[in-house]
């Protein structure tokens, strides 16, 4: 837990930090990448790097740069055009980051990910190893979504979500999301001049979504996506700071403890590596709607999910696939590796353990999902 002492946050002990910088902070009013701005960010990142922090950078800006290079007046809305813009702009984005970091004798590495890379266990572990090697070599990974090959089914959707997933993957001590807003307000400051900036909130507080607003022209993420990302990072035990990138030397100042932005705290212990991989599944093979008793058993008692607690089986999945468990309102409770196919799950849903044997006529696990193979939300 990050402490606040004498009006300052104790962030200096956060060694491994994922920093996400939004499009509006990297582009010149929509006129392509802003070299001066990126050089300014490189200086701040270099200062943290040289102070011993391990920085993983998630950088937006590829689509915005591609739009300028192709002389497009507005952001494309269809996926193929977005993919083409990203492919064109990514060349300029990574070249710029590499050049400005080289000015500080720091090497950069390009890492492109899709959700499918993290959902596949082998690729997830491979990317973990690659990122760890880069960190060990004191190279700064510059991460972006691999828009060119992503489809709607395997997209993160925005770099806020990607940053949260990476924070869990690398066991980060802190996620910093830099945006054009000061942080989280108790109401939309664009419509309420009396809106107050929240200094510290709990990432799990549902009321936060009611306070969030929409996104800008060049980026995909508004405050809603940032709140969702903070909650996702919190599931891995990683706190999130959302702050304005327009504040002078914001990275150095927040790491020195200055109370800028909004800190999203977590009261969850860090998940195991296997649980973090499970939590990385934004899309799953199927869904189990569970009753209130099962929700309580999972969330409060950390029990396995038994067939008796399952009300509805949705989707087609095989034994060992990752599925999500939701309550009767559709809110995600957990994700886990299921011990039965969707066909068998449909047969045994709602049955007590003694009847499962009778119906299936074979000895097998009594749990629909064992607690050791479950990530709780």
Swiss-Prot record:
Its EC number is 2.7.2.11. Keywords: Amino-acid biosynthesis, ATP-binding, Cytoplasm, Kinase, Nucleotide-binding, Proline biosynthesis, Transferase. One of its GO terms (cellular component) is cytosol. InterPro entries: AceGlu_kinase-like_sf, Asp/Glu/Uridylate_kinase, G5K_ProB, Glu/AcGlu_kinase, Glu_5kinase, Glu_5kinase/COase_Synthase, Glutamate_5-kinase_CS, PUA. GO terms for biological process: L-proline biosynthetic process. PROSITE patterns: GLUTAMATE_5_KINASE, PUA. It is found in: Cytoplasm. This is Glutamate 5-kinase. The lineage of its organism: Bacteria, Pseudomonadati, Pseudomonadota, Gammaproteobacteria, Moraxellales.
